[in-house]
Amino acid sequence: QIARMDKTQFVVYVARLFSRKGYAVKLTPVADNYCIDMLVEKQGTITAVSVVQSTGLLGKNDVACVCEGRRHYPANNAMVLTNSYYDSSAVDYAREHGLALVDHNVLASQYMA
């Protein structure tokens, strides 16, 4: 089902998943959003979320723009969420910069369950 969605459909789908988990969700503008697709808030903590739909592994460059992007929003944390997986360079970069990474397995087990 997710594989057939376009980017906008996937972002809306993820927003609904967050809403069902009790988050307040605010979608950012489609253009000029600094790689941040939505802000999610729960218990006073705001997370800037980048939603990446991909058929291949995501690398460092795929997650790096989120570090810069979160500075443009009132967010405490940042997350990259994908229907795919991350390579080791993305994982290392995220660890260094305090980014949360959600891959296909985590998406299926923690958000879609």
Mark where each language-model region is.
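Mixed-charge (Asp/Glu-Lys/Arg
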Residues: 1-113
